[in-house]
C-alpha cells in the first residue's frame, strides 16, 4: 500500500496506479476538510508551515533535484520576496496579497542576475557560492536604510482572530503546494524535465546532443526563484514582520535541501515525503539540542544519505518495486497442461 501511494505513476491505467492517485485525492480532501472544520491552532499552524516548505522544496527540486545543482541559497529569494512585499507596504501602503506576484517577479529577476555568473559553476563551487550569496544578502539587508536595518519592518496584522489567520494561510499554502506540485509533475514529463535530467547525468554530453543547457538552467532557476519569492511574500504577511537574521536564516535553506534529499531529489513525490519527516525531526531535536548542534546533525544526515541512500525514500521505494517486479517476472508460471 505504501509503494502504491507514493508510486502511482507506474503502470499507467493499471489498478495500482488508479488506487495510488485515489489515495492522493483522499488525502487532499481530508486536508481540505480539516482546514474547514479543524479548530486546533497549533495543528493548523504546523500544517501551514509544512505546506509552505513543500512549496519551497518543490521549487528547489527544479534545479537541485532534476538538474543536479546543489543550491544552498533558496532562502535568499524567499527573503527577497518577503522584503519586497514589506517595503511596498511600508512605503506605499500596498497589500501583501496584491504585491505577492511583484515579489515573485523581483526574486526571479534577482535569480536571473545572480544566475548569469553562478550557473556557469558546477559541483561544490556552485554550492559554496550560493551559501556566500545568502550571507552577503543578509548583511546587505542589515546595512541598508530602506530595509530598516536590524530593526526590520513591521506590517499590520490581518483583522482576523489568530485561528482565522492560521486558517487563511493554511489554505493559501495548501493551494500553492498543490499548484506547484502539479507544475513540477508536468515539467518532469516535459522536454524541459528531460533536459534537466540530462544536465544532471552529464552536462557536457547534454550540450553535445543539442541541449541548450545554459538557457534551461536559467529558466529553471528563474521559476524556482519566482515561487520562493511569492512564498516569502505570503510568509511576511503571515507573521507581519521581517528582519534580516530570521528572514535570511541559513537554516531555512538547509532544511529545504534536507527535505528534498531525504524524500527523493528529482521526483515530485520527494518533497511531499521529506518535508514532514524533516520538520518532525527538527522539532524533536530543537527540544534537546542547540541550533548549532542541530546544523551539525543535519549536515551529517545529508552526507550519509548522499553516500548510502542517494535517491532518498523514493529511491528506496523505486528499487524495492523494481526488485519485486523482477522477482515476479522470473517466477515460473504455475499453469501447466
Provide a role label for each language-model segment.
Residues 1-337:
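Transmembrane alpha-helices and adjacent helix-loop boundaries
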